Amino acid sequence: MIQRSIAGCDFARGGVDNTSIVVRNSYEIVEVVNLHHADTNEICSVYRKLDMKYHFKGTYLDATGGYDIGFYDALKDQYNLTEVNFAGKSLDPNCNNARTYIYDCLARAIKNGFYINTVKYKDIFDALKSTSYLINSQGKKALVPKEEIKAIIGHSPDATDALALSFYGSHDAMEIKVTPELQQQLINTLFR
């Protein structure tokens, strides 16, 4: 049986930021692809290849700023794509916007066992360590501004945003599915 994965895509156009596609399953990151100065055709091509390999059941796109429009229009009839505007409304009334919500979902997943290889995905780990939230004047969780995270890690947290996007509206990572292979891997790691 093929395990279907979920993807998150954070788009960039020019500058120093990357377009990042993060592929995950229910319990870990599977692959991260960072594209620098990629045009829509290249991003679509890379995405199609990843989908052939991982069989996405859903993909969440950063629609903030409209950089996803060409990608979305080209692929919306072929794939299960969901646009997420970071400044948009949160699905959780305790979070001030969609960006806070997706990071809150990611944090809950990590607390429940979602694994991030901190060596292989050091940039994601560093960005997560630099991300915090506060309670705003309306009593809701609010992430620190992205500029503060950039100042700490020295670049935009593109791959981390893509990973967080993959948790939008998702509850699958809240209940970690431990396959026999993962169980054996954990046993081998713990009892070396």
Label the predicted regions.
Residues 19, 57, 160:
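Residue-level detector of short, conserved catalytic/binding motifs and their immediate flanks
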